[in-house]
UniProtKB/Swiss-Prot annotation:
It comes from the Eukaryota. This is Pyridoxal-dependent decarboxylase domain-containing protein 1. Keywords: Decarboxylase, Lyase, Pyridoxal phosphate. It comes from Xenopus laevis. The keyword Transcription does not apply.
Length: 782
């Protein structure tokens, strides 16, 4: 296996297989039983799936199948849209921990108990020291919400003494209340209530600040009033979930004041958030440092340190181990304690310096991006960074709206969300290693978020990636500004032209949306809708074939508007009027061609029927003229030899344009086939006159105007230089003829000297008069 695995394409799978193979050899220590050949009857059944039939497959085949499944969808995706996780050596240690946990679980019970106790105690001690959480216990769980669920069970057991015996009957008389911030993860409170079997009335969402402080932090004064109201109503305030780094903006609640409030009303304080990672740094802000005094906190070390498939950890303080066991925070099964093994291996591999370096690197990346954003005036950070958060949230804001009176402020606000959505998608596609994503904030709207603590260790984000992100942002800002500035002009141009309808779709970030309205008298709505769909599809195809920088599409697949043309982002020199006129002209042409094709089909069908009638009539006339005897094979040949028919055969041609049967007499007379009427020339737009290399829908820039002025000036200088040349002498008779209206020499004739004999020669000689080309050129220029 060791020799065959390195031949695999995926280096990660090959390296993991190699590490597992070496680890198994070291642990087994030559105690593997000799492999005996498997003899016997192979049982096969038709209902058994193919991969399970037979005697099984080797490890290489199974890993090859896993590799194919992992990389099957990557061929359909572009490389820029993929986010490849950076699985380093520390990641291999975490993956190795899962395999070792499975191997250790087969040890004898006494060895397993000692080993799991050592692993669990070491990991818990290390985490409590790293994150400044003294005298704490740890619970390791796969789902990051499971820790909060177990803590809620612990608090219920602590506050309701008869809960173990009476169950939910105890809760009925005095309902528990769980307080959760409005800025917490969506669905967190509902998930806890569903798992605990509590009604949603036990969940109280605490609003954030509206007047003072950050709008993403919990309103402490309002929370105090809510707790007092619940106590007066006979309810039991149970637990408060606070944030040290909200999921959206990364802000930290006032944990110090919240802890005092919880101590006053005997409420359990649970804290979670990305800012808890900064507790491992040497300098920690006071707002985050207050989290060390809380009753429990949840840490997600996997994304923070780039460790795949490691469990989340909930640190908590409680003195009664029996209640912790009843709540599920501790387990008597040694196998359950092996969840900490991947972390136990990874933390030892990284060491204290490696852990601090990864968290510090993420904080430095966010500060670097924040400093660069200050130099970009159109990009704003609507959520002020409180200094303790590594999360950067920014948003594009059009500054020209205040100075430009033609733009509607309400329209710009509605379009800004779509533009920022487009901006976030573009940045994520252009710089996938940056890990930027899009977040919807309640007051600020759609924003772009850079959260390096959750992505940089996994994606391997570097300072160069941040610089590339800023460069892409600078490149996209002019496109956003030009598109937003031309939106109103595009709407006016579309509404000005009959046959086009402007569609208000604020979810589209491009120039705009329009629909081509056909001039049809069709009464059937389904037929009219089908015709419009055909015209729209053909129009989109022709527009995408044009040489232009614009993009045209049919919009979202499940959008509300159908048969529309969605126009993408615009450049500064876009000629909106030419664009709209071109779309209208193309739509009319497609509609007329389709209508002409339908009419031609009907005309041709009628013409064919009429031609069949005429041909049958001609056959009957020929039969009457020639007689019946001439139609008999042998007799007809004899009669034709004795008395040949003198009638000329009548040829016929079918005119597709007119749909009629015509004679071929003119064809035989003129010895050429007539083509009928010449179709009228296709009208060309004045906008079609473009310079060489210039794309469609582009306004002429100042450079092109200056070039035309320079070319005209140089042409005049050339004319003046030609007039300054000495004029050659020529015959006076030619001058008289020219003065009388007879042409002397045109410009075309002067290009090749021609011999013109003079009529009035005193000596009657035929000497030619050869005019000069320069003379004719100068006369024509004058």
């Amino acid at each position: 296996m060791q020799k065959q695995i390195p031949q695999m394409v995926d280096p990660t799978l090959a390296e993991m297989g190699k590490n597992l193979d070496e680890a198994m050899k070291i642990l087994e220590d030559n105690q593997r039983p000799s492999e005996e050949e498997k003899d016997g009857k192979k049982y096969t059944r038709k209902d058994i799936p193919g991969p399970l039939q037979g005697s099984g497959q080797n490890m290489v085949s199974v890993l090859q199948l896993v590799q194919n499944l992992m990389h099957d969808d990557e061929e359909e995706q572009s490389p820029s849209l993929r986010r490849i996780q950076n699985v380093g050596e520390q990641g291999h240690m975490a993956l190795l921990g899962h395999s070792l946990a499975a191997y250790i679980s087969v040890l004898d019970r006494e060895h397993l108990r000692k080993l799991t106790t050592r692993i669990l105690s070491d990991t818990t001690l290390w985490l409590c020291r790293l994150f400044r959480y003294d005298n704490g216990s740890a619970y390791y769980h796969e789902d990051d919400r499971e820790g909060l669920l177990k803590v809620c069970r612990l608090v219920i057991h602590s506050r309701y003494e008869d809960y173990t015996t009476d169950g939910f009957n105890v809760l009925y008389n005095k309902l528990p209340v769980i307080y959760i911030s409005a800025a917490s993860r969506p669905g967190l409170g509902q998930s806890v209530c569903n798992q605990l079997g509590l009604p949603l009335s036990c969940l109280c969402r605490v609003p954030c600040n509206t007047m003072f402080g950050s709008q993403h932090e919990m309103d402490v004064a309002l929370l105090d009033r809510l707790i007092k109201d619940d106590i007066q109503s006979g309810k039991c305030p149970l637990l408060l979930v606070a944030n040290a780094g909200t999921p959206g903006a990364g802000h930290t609640d006032k944990l110090g004041r919240l802890k005092e409030l919880c101590d006053q009303y005997n409420i359990w304080l649970h804290v979670e958030g990305v800012n808890l990672a900064t507790l491992a740094l040497g300098y920690v802000s006071s707002s985050v440092l207050a989290a060390t005094k809380c009753d429990s906190m949840t840490l997600t070390l996997g994304p923070w340190l780039g460790l795949p498939a490691v469990p989340a950890v909930t640190l908590y303080r409680h003195e009664d181990p029996s209640l912790s066991l009843a709540a599920g925070l501790t387990s008597s099964q040694p196998v359950e304690k092996l969840r900490a093994l991947p972390l136990w291996l990874s933390l030892q591999y990284l060491g204290h310096s490696g852990i601090v370096e990864r968290i510090k690197h993420a904080s430095q990346l966010s500060q670097k991006l924040l400093e660069n954003l200050k130099n970009l005036s159109p990009v704003k950070t609507p959520v002020e960074n409180d200094g303790s958060s590594p999360v950067v949230v920014f948003r594009f804001v059009y500054e020209g709206c205040k100075s430009d009176s033609t733009l509607n402020l309400s329209t710009i606000e509605r379009d800004s969300d779509a533009l920022n959505q487009w901006l976030g998608d573009q940045l994520a596609a252009l710089v996938p290693s940056s890990g930027v994503d899009i977040v919807e904030l309640e007051d600020e709207g759609t924003c772009v978020r850079f959260n390096p603590l959750m992505t940089c260790a996994v994606l391997g984000t570097t300072a160069e990636d941040v610089e590339q992100l800023v460069a892409c942002l600078r490149m996209k800002i002019p496109v956003l500004e030009n598109t937003l500035r031309l939106k109103e002009e595009f709407r006016q141009e579309v509404e000005r032209i009959a046959g086009l309808s402007y569609i208000n779709d604020y979810s589209w970030a491009g120039l705009g949306v329009l629909r081509y309205e056909q001039f049809s008298e069709e009464q059937d709505a389904a037929k009219r809708e089908a015709d419009l769909e055909k015209i729209t599809v053909a129009l989109l195809k022709k527009l995408n074939e044009l040489e232009t920088d614009l993009t045209f599409c049919s919009g979202p697949e499940f959008g509300a508007e159908k048969n529309c043309i969605y126009i993408g982002m615009a450049s500064e020199d876009l000629d909106v009027s030419e664009l709209v006129e071109t779309i209208t002209a193309m739509g009319r042409e497609i509609e007329e061609n389709s209508r002409l094709l339908e009419n031609m089909t009907e005309v041709v069908r009628k013409g064919i029927l009429e031609a069949e009638v005429q041909l049958n009539k001609a056959n009957e006339e020929r039969l009457l003229e020639e007689g019946v005897l001439r139609q008999i094979p042998l007799v007809g040949s004899m009669l034709n030899w004795l008395s040949p028919v003198q009638a000329t055969p009548k040829g016929r041609t079918f005119n597709l344009t007119a749909g009629s049967l015509e004679t071929t007499e003119m064809t035989y007379i003129s010895k050429a086939q007539t083509t009928g009427l010449t179709p009228p020339p296709t009208p060309t737009s004045a906008h079609g006159k473009r310079q060489a290399g210039q794309k469609l829908f582009k306004r002429l820039s100042r450079n092109s105007d200056a070039m035309s002025e320079t070319s005209s000036i140089s042409h005049l200088e050339e004319v003046e230089s030609l007039e300054a040349l000495p004029m050659p002498e020529y015959d006076s008779s030619a001058a008289e003829n020219s003065a009388m209206g007879e042409p002397f020499a045109t410009a075309e004739q002067s290009s090749t000297p021609s011999i013109v004999p003079t009529e009035t020669s005193s000596e009657g000689s035929q000497e030619p008069s050869i005019p000069s080309a320069n003379t004719a050129e100068s006369d024509s220029l004058r």
